[in-house]
Amino acid sequence: MSVLNVLESHVILHIIEFLPDHEKIKFMSTCKSLYEFRCHVTYNNFYVYDTINHLDFVNKFKKLIYLSIFNENSKNYDPTIIVKSIKDVIPPNTKCIIFDDDFDEDITEFIPEGIKYVVFGIHFNKPIKKILPNSIIHLILGFSFNQSISDILPCGLIELTLGHNFRQSINDIPNTITKLIFDSEFIPEIHGKIPTNINCLGIRGYFGKNHKKDIPNNIKHLIIGTDYHSKMCEVIEDSIDMIITENMTHITLGWNFDDTTFNIPNGVTHLILYQKFNPTIIKCLPSSVEHVEFISRW
């Protein structure tokens, strides 16, 4: 007997909502009856608006990227027509804004209330005081950003990434943040300054001589050197063991750990290893490890 004959439509729809977008499509493509659900499920990945705007269920896509091409060489170009704010031209259902890498302009009144994800590009380095709505939950400050973040971060912010050139104080991080990533070659003094609500800490640039006392006990997921090709292993005193605490359950280890040996503590359940990682440096894996993931090639 078909599952469609056993379960009510709303039950099937509820089950589908638990699947990632690509699995939803696969599942609904198995038969004509299920395919009819495509107009009723929610799609949570990022999609370019121009690729899906022909569909009748555009409102089911929650994260749309709007792209526009402006030709300054156009014969119809009028240099006196200047858009002073894009707040009023951003569609009301927009949840994410990604700034181009070349963008480095004042963004006063750029970001409307309701935006949840904001990503600044490589060259952006303008003050952002009083311009970030409290609806933002995920903020990435790009490579060049080096402005004060004191008293300017949204009160509902959950994830914060600080870029490569960041050299400012982190004393005023909102207590709502649970994930903090340093992409910088400069790591500020973090001892006693990481809020207790943060459970994921990423140090993906120059690590410096940090110790276990600098990593609060509330950190469950530690990310080290994932994206930035640094020389962090040359400055870590004695061993990685010095900064891995017993409370951690998830550890992500990036590049340049070839010459370091360390133990994975008991209690770690997830281990992610990136390329250029020498697997022989791990002395042993505790029985608590349930998931090991190898990213890219060895």
Swiss-Prot record:
InterPro entries: FNIP, STK_FNIP-Repeat. FNIP repeats lie at residues 124-165, 255-297. Keywords: Repeat. Pfam families: FNIP. Residues 4-48 form the F-box domain. It comes from the Viruses. This is Putative F-box and FNIP repeat-containing protein R286. The lineage of its organism: Viruses, Varidnaviria, Bamfordvirae, Nucleocytoviricota, Megaviricetes.
